[in-house]
């Protein structure tokens, strides 16, 4: 029974949390649709011999796309329709992100979101997703259990005399797993110990011990990534490993175990 620790309580999300979760997932679906449209525009240009040398999806690139000299009217109309869909999706996502910021400022979420935003790679959308999708972080006894819940723990193929390590299990909450992998991709850039103005602004207003814990995590994760790369690990393998450790640090932050090392 529960009183003797024989069973663990099952977390049941509130209707409020579930509604926020659905809104966030809807936003993610539109983000995927935007990615698909970008791929379609790129493919169209390649098929018809239009190559852009600079960084794509900047203002300069968008201006280039709109001013392409295309003599075939139907080709031009096709690209214009693609560009219209692109701009429509961009406007939607901008509107959704504004609404997500408003939700994150609600009393029940604000403090937790501010804490999670102290980590490199975690901004409002990711922070709020972690909170409402996970619910009660304390149902996980350790950080590595939380990483397993997200499918970020390494698998293994064991026999009586050997253990063969595998990649991450990918068994668990795929939405949060993808968000943390994307966040880790942001961590794995830049100098170890560097704090941008944007990160300092996000950390502003938090307690000193919260910022110190996040700084420790940021430094460790970035250092670990570069160590993996120096030792010949593939980038995607290294990023997945960093995502696992980031999940452990997130668990520590949300359960007030901020003196603990990542599991």
Summary of predicted features, one role per range:
Residues 56-66, 138, 188, 215, ...:
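HhH-family (HhH-GPD) DNA N-glycosylase catalytic core used in base-excision repair
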Residues 30, 89, 180, 232, ...:
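A residue-level signal for conserved active-site and pocket-lining positions in enzyme catalytic cores
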Residues 1-14, 21-22, 61-68, 162-171, ...:
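Short alpha-helix plus adjacent loop in nuclease-associated cores
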Residues 1-43, 193:
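Extended, highly charged alpha-helical segments
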Residues 5-9, 37-38, 93, 135-139, ...:
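Short helix-capping/linker segments at secondary-structure and domain boundaries
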Residues 114-118, 124, 129-231:
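Phosphate-backbone recognition surface of nucleic-acid-processing proteins
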Residues 223-263:
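Basic, amphipathic alpha-helical segments enriched in Lys/Arg and hydrophobic/aromatic residues
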Residues 24-115, 203-207:
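Glycine-rich, often acidic, oxyanion-interacting loops/wings at catalytic, nucleic-acid
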């Amino acid at each position: 029974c529960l009183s003797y620790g024989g069973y663990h309580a099952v977390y049941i999300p509130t209707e409020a949390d579930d509604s926020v979760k659905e809104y966030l997932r809807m936003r993610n679906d539109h983000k995927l649709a935007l990615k698909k449209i970008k791929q379609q525009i790129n493919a169209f240009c390649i098929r018809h011999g239009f190559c852009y040398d600079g960084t794509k999806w900047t203002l300069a690139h968008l201006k280039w796309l709109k001013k392409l000299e295309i003599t075939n009217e139907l080709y031009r109309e096709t690209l214009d329709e693609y560009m219209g869909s692109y701009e429509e999706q961009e406007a939607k996502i901008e509107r959704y992100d504004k609404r997500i910021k408003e939700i994150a400022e609600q009393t029940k979420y604000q403090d937790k979101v501010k804490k999670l935003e102290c980590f490199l790679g975690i901004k409002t959308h990711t922070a709020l997703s972690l909170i409402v999708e996970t619910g009660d972080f304390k149902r996980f006894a350790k950080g590595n259990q939380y990483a397993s819940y997200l499918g970020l723990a390494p698998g293994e193929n064991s026999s009586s005399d050997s253990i063969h390590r595998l990649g991450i299990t990918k068994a668990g909450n795929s939405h949060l797993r993808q968000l943390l992998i994307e966040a880790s991709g942001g961590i794995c850039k830049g100098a170890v110990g560097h704090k941008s103005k944007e990160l300092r602004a996000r950390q502003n207003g938090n307690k000193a011990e919260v910022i110190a814990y996040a700084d420790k995590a940021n430094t460790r994760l970035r250092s670990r990534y570069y160590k993996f790369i120096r030792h010949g690990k593939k980038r995607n393998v290294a990023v997945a490993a960093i995502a696992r450790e980031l999940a452990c640090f997130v668990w520590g932050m949300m359960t007030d175990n901020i003196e603990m090392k990542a599991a």
